Amino acid sequence: RDTHETWYLETQEGKNLPVPHCIRGTEGWQIRKELDALRKTEPIDKETFGSTDLAADLLALHEDEEIGSITLVGLCTDICVISNALLLKATLPEVPIYVDAAYCAGVTPESHENALKAMEACQIKVMR
């Protein structure tokens, strides 16, 4: 879950993307209630584009019980989704990583498509 603090605009990301969003505790920060039943663990709050905590948690899980594959969805394809897909591919190179394009969106349709192509070039399987 994309998570920022009230001082977001003072961060490197905030200076380059000066659009306050996903501020902890505000409307729009929480994952939609309709998805609660599908969750098996608490959400991981990620304060940057890619989550090293997500990668570490999945690596630990994989070491205990082999992960067959990972599917990513979300916003923004061209920022957070691609960052996490590449991070997971580097952390778990033998686990197939999928991105379901129907459940992703980029800043623009063009940047969405460019991100999907970049992920495909890095052996991430894009479901179209």
Locate predicted features:
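Short, solvent-exposed turn/loop segments enriched in Gly/Ser/Thr/Pro and often Arg
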Residues: R1
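Active-site-adjacent betaalpha module
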Residues: H4-R128
